[in-house]
A protein has these predicted regions:
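Extended, low-polarity transmembrane helix blocks
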Residues: 1-98, 105-175
Length: 175
């Protein structure tokens, strides 16, 4: 009987208020940034490459820059995203919106938090060594990890109902 009562009380089953608050704050923050980026045509094929150019340009150069120092990241971006910025701009548009909505509504929260972890690691690497305060991305990454580890969608989220109806998701990685 003790094992059953412990399982009922675990965050996996009942959720966590702390993870729920963190999930909502991170979700609304991501949505606000996404809306701002949309309003500035950030994801547009013509504007998107300029973001990466700015990140790796020296702050002392004409027009300034962030001065990121991880040249291997720049090489990867040059060989992938910057070869098809319009395509990857659209991909990022939907990935960032998907992360925000997943976190806000608590639907497929574990998958959304895994996507957020990858997204924030990417931002950390792009900004690393530059003028930007890098710890912002560490905090965002930490929040996404906490949401994943504490089953952030199991309280006040759609995942709570999905888990009751369907049981556990494959490998516990979706809801």
């Amino acid at each position: 009987m003790k094992a059953t009562s412990e399982a009922i009380e675990s965050p996996k089953v009942r959720g966590s208020l702390g993870a729920t608050v963190t999930r909502l704050v991170l979700g609304f923050t991501t949505l606000a940034v996404w809306i701002d980026n949309i309003s500035k045509d950030f994801y547009d094929g013509e504007n998107f490459p300029g973001f990466f150019d700015f990140q790796f340009r020296s702050p002392e150069s004409e027009g300034g820059g962030n001065g990121s120092t991880l040249t291997f990241v720049q090489d990867i971006l040059d060989a992938t995203i910057l070869q098809a910025p319009e395509f990857f701009g659209w991909i990022l548009t939907f990935v960032e919106l998907g992360i925000a909505l997943s976190l806000i509504f608590g639907i497929f929260t574990r998958a959304g938090s895994i996507a957020a972890i990858g997204f924030f690691i990417g931002l950390f690497l792009v900004y690393f060594g530059g003028e930007e305060w890098i710890w912002t991305y560490v905090l965002l990454l930490g929040a996404a990890v906490a949401i994943f580890l504490d089953w952030g969608g199991r309280l006040l989220g759609v995942d709570q109902f999905i888990a009751k109806v369907k049981g556990e998701s494959p490998f516990g990685l979706i809801w």
